[in-house]
Curated annotation (Swiss-Prot):
Taxonomic lineage: Bacteria, Bacillati, Mycoplasmatota, Mycoplasmoidales, Mycoplasmoidaceae
Protein name in the entry: Transcriptional regulator MraZ
Native source species: Mycoplasmoides gallisepticum (strain R(low / passage 15 / clone 2))
Matches recorded under Pfam families: MraZ
Gene from which this protein is expressed: mraZ
Domain SpoVT-AbrB: from-to ranges: 5-47, 76-119
NCBIfam families xref list: division/cell wall cluster transcriptional repressor MraZ
Annotated localization: Cytoplasm, Nucleoid
Highest taxon in the source lineage: Bacteria
Amino acid sequence: MFIGNYQHNIDPKGRLSIPSKLRSLIQDSVVLSRGLDGCLELRTNQEFENYANKFLSQSNNKQQNRNYKRLLFANSLTVEIDSANRILIPANFKKMANLSKEVVIIGMGDHIELWDINAYEQFNEANFDKFNELAESMDDDH
């Protein structure tokens, strides 16, 4: 399970090191995709397939379904992990999440989120004190 909060820098060539505690749970490649709330997401190939299958089973007759699938699959890419445990984040993906140099890497259980440090700090400031409230609202989903 992916857990923890790590801060790493994107190097001048666009590479980001994957923390060793997260790397041990990943094979030689991951799927990089557009995430929710302005971040990027990393999933193992198997987890991305599981995630994608939820949407593939939905009808293409609905415009909203087609639009989401287009945005998801067009903005997803398999990236290799190099011998130094780094992934290359293409320029268009960095732009998508407004990533500059400093990145916060968040374990989200079944996937990893990559956040621009400023965006993550804003999220954290807005939500940190709402932990109990958010936990209670999750009970409504079951």
